[in-house]
């Protein structure tokens, strides 16, 4: 039960994990798919042209980090959806529905929970208070150097874990769909990722994400329509026929089959819910619009697109039960699905649209990874150049040219590191990194952002101790947990018995921040509390906020 639970969770906790087997089992390499290769090359050619176009319009620091603030709310909503909707969601959740039925819907809802928090509590204030990174907001009335250092470290740890998982996921996915060598796939993704961000900055990254979102939504919509057409657009027929052909029968319509440990499930739920609001590459997108109103519209549109997409994956999963499961064309000699369960959506694409549509869906799956790694790389580069170099090392006195140069050097270094780690971790089960990334975002980044915006008694001392406490607790508990302590290090029993640390590390972060703030009687602390009123006025009105260019 534990193994089943873990392999299920590894499918969809992050956009990086585009496949179950890539992380938890054998990868079945597919024959070279020429149509998929052609469509992928068309996508790459188009996005490289966009990068060239964007490079001509990226002249300043604001252009590079935020596309000059000229992205509309609708465009940014699509881009956020493109950054968030993943190959993991498309292949992973549909695979879970194919294998276990109703439980897949529960996990897809888990991804949506965090967006109302961003919509109602974070988006507008973040846009009014910040400029390029969420550290601008966290350090608004606190001491710049320690807070920016903490925020940058939290961002870089999340980005690094995300990138490792993305690169391993990319290599395995391309091996599955295209038949290419794993190392070739990882190097290819790394090179494209660097090109997009190095030359096109946020403008190129945004349009890559928009194109990917449109392709993914279009492809998934077509698949869902074809599935519903096969049952005369009757959901009762879809579910009743699926129950008849599925080996588990009626149990696929019941929830709870994948939950073996309530504490781990609760901890994962907290990480997903609050970690989303602490992901640096998602938060960075709110600075690409002109004002708080457009930021709010961005989240509204993004939530709509993402919610619609997860409904589609549920239909696609049941469609695979109905149209792929009984079809021996998609099975091997042992009766198992070719390529593993996570190929269910890809086989369904073949079943409803033939080889041409199969090629399109394969290319879309690869495009999802390119869109996400581009956003991650830019978030990591901005944390180094804007937060660490310009604000900490140069104490806010760096010139724009030097800051951009540092950012671009960081992009190249991140690309090389991502390729190296992707190759290094090829044989590893890296699912634990996914849980750790969300847990760190929820335990370090989220508490700092939310408390700094809403609590007038916060001081630098409280934020520093609470933030580092959350970050270190998440890492230590993950190391002492069953995945690393037992599976990787080979000990008999874990010291920390649960899969995810967020339940405890978040509590540590919030309590630490609260306690060390209220006990801070220093003059600096008193001054920081007095500055809350001016921060509150700006966060509500936008007076003095950085403005984007004209749309």
From Swiss-Prot:
Belongs to the sodium:solute symporter (SSF) (TC 2.A.21) family. PANTHER family: CATION_ACETATE SYMPORTER ACTP, SODIUM/PROLINE SYMPORTER-RELATED. It is found in: Cell inner membrane. This is Cation/acetate symporter ActP. CDD domains: SLC5sbd_u4 (cd11480). The keyword Protein transport does not apply. It holds the Pfam family SSF. It is a multi-pass membrane protein. It comes from Yersinia pseudotuberculosis serotype O:1b (strain IP 31758). Keywords: Cell inner membrane, Cell membrane, Ion transport, Membrane, Sodium, Sodium transport, Symport, Transmembrane, Transmembrane helix, Transport. Transports acetate.
